[in-house]
Amino acid sequence: MKYEFKSFAKINHFLNILDKRKDGYHNIQSIFQLINLFDVITFEQRSDNIINLNCNIENLKQNNSILDAINIFKKEYKIKKLGLDIYLKKSIPIGGGLGGGSSNAAVTLKALTEIWKIKKNNYSLSNLALRLGSDVPFFLNGKNAWVEGRGEIITNVDLKPYWFILIFSQYSVS
């Protein structure tokens, strides 16, 4: 069976960087807004333990957020046999500062809970998300939000619709 998910990008309306934490991260304040730019990730179960990841971008590293999410999920839920064919249709620019990798990781966590019919415990899934990256809990939440702490304190907010013009450089910013 194939499962297909949209993995949305986000913009930061602003980013207020506060004090440095003992864990090496900084506390932040920001408003994150999902935008209508997304990657599409398709998952199909395999009967073996092989994970194949294919992408429309040739140089996508085999060490990426989707595989990181799979590995952390397998360890957390003690899944021995997890074979998947994954196809990532990348539309969010890599290194564009729009959270594409974090969004892909969050979607992967959601997909795996659905594919393996794991009863979701939002607290444990959020902890997994935070281990993958500071933006991942926001994408797991899936709503526009006021974000604080390292990124794990999330308060949903209603935002008016906006039009944005995004300009992408050849240089990576994340």
Model-derived regions, located:
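Residue-level signature for short turns and capping positions that connect secondary-structure elements
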Residues: 18, 48, 58, 91-93, ...
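Phosphate-handling active-site elements
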Residues: 75-85, 111-130
